[in-house]
Amino acid sequence: ISIDTRRSDVAAAALDAGANMVNDVSGLRDPAMESLVIARGCAVCIMHMQGEPGNMQQNPTYDDVCSEVYESLISTANKLVSKGHDSAMICLDPGIGFGKNLTHNLELLHSRSNSDYSILWGVSRKSMFKQLLGRERTEDRLAGTLGVAAHAMLEGVDILRVHDVEAHNDLLTTLATLRPELNS
């Protein structure tokens, strides 16, 4: 069970209630979050976001989005490990759609970190499919989402965050049947 929060007090309450993973969309910007994650020894997903939720889509800019995003994530993860956190309990999320425009998102989807940390992609129903495919309604973005999920599996992405679990299970089962080497 994962708690999706940027606030260490909320994460602590969720961990007390039985959650075993913190998914922090701010990349551990709350100084107390790092200490909490280390003290509890829980799994953590560190996500990249340029800016804050209220302003993150206002002209996001990068010199090299892939390098900047993954260097930031790896630096944060390495800091946790240097303070005693188990690297196997850390996954990195490049934050598709969080402080990135369509070009940035596509560049990130065409690249992958060469770190030893697990990689998570959360692309389910994202607004990029509105731009890419003209799908206004989120419920009409499944085909695009599944296309990226197939690409993710072929690229070796470790974890997908999805809404349509059954459709993704069918896709990944079919792809693993056709490409057994991907099932390892």
Regions found by a protein language model. Give the residues of each.
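Active-site-adjacent loop and "lid" segments of alpha/beta metabolic enzymes
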Residues: 5-9, 15-16, 20-79, 98-184
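Short acidic capping loops at alpha-helix termini that bridge into adjacent secondary structure
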Residues: 86-89
